[in-house]
Structures are given as structure tokens and as C-alpha cells.
């Protein structure tokens, strides 16, 4: 109904273009309605600088276990260590939210099962895994902005946890984007909204969904 009302012919989706376009949920929808669908992420995640890390006043070598939920925070952690000339001890343990994130550690360290644990991607699974290692001194690697649920829960459990921001979500380069070309822009997060409204005046924006 909304398509007929607005005479929609072109949509922008704020996501990376799927590797297999036919598997996109928009593919059949676009074909059935004779729509053009473009894909462009409006945000990106970048590691913090060494200066930003040091401002958080956390000593990596005072901790025994890293908690990771993304590849970007892993990259940032090891980049910070390299830049600060910190040698990560072989005794360091790692807890990851998924197996895919855990396997990414192989880029930097020898993968040993006794050192690396991973959850199934759910909050409760990750929490149980952390509690199982309750005597460790943790660094919780975060991407800003982040949901406070996990750091607050770990604090209530009185675990030795240092929440540290290793990455930030920032606006992508939108200089080549003309939002007036589109009838609808599909956004997926508050960060998408922020990036779009900071880059363009509201009167230049089409319908946002």
C-alpha cells in the first residue's frame, strides 16, 4: 500500500551489498514491485587510537582474560599492544561470544582450546562462560556505543572486570551519496539515523523506514 501511495521506484538499504544478491530479503520484493535497490552502509567501526586507549587507564598486563564480541575489537586490541610495545603473555586467556570470533584469534595467536572459550552468541551463554572463570581478571572489550547490560551484570556479580572501549561506531564516508535520488531509505540502527541526519539536512531526506 505504501509503495503505491508514495510511487516508490528506488530504495537505499543501509547494509553492505549481499555477496549473493538473490539471497537478500529485498531481492524478490524488488523484482515483484519493479524497484531499484541500492546498498550502502552508513556507518563503520574503527579501532581507538593508542591515546584514546591510554585515557581509559587500564593496564593490559594486570589482567588474565580478554572478553571479545567482535573481530574489530580483536584487531584493535592487538594493534594497541603492538603500538604500545606490550607483549601479550602466552598465559592470557580469551572468551568470545561466538566460535567465529574465537577462530579469528588465529590471526594473532596460536589457537589452543585450553586458552580460548566461546559462547553460542547469546547473552546468557556468554555470561555463564565468564562466571565459570570467575577467578580471572577480565578486560571486557567494547565497541562504543554499547549496551550496558553485560558490564552492569558483571559488576553486580562482583567479578574483577575492566570495561574498555577498543572500537567506536562512526559515520561512513557519505560524500558520494545523494539521498534525494531515493524514495525510501531503510535504516537498521540508531547509529544509521545519526549518521544520515548529521550528514544531510532533514528537508533533503526521503521517507525513512
Pin down the residues of each PLM region.
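Conserved beta-alpha
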Residues: 2-209
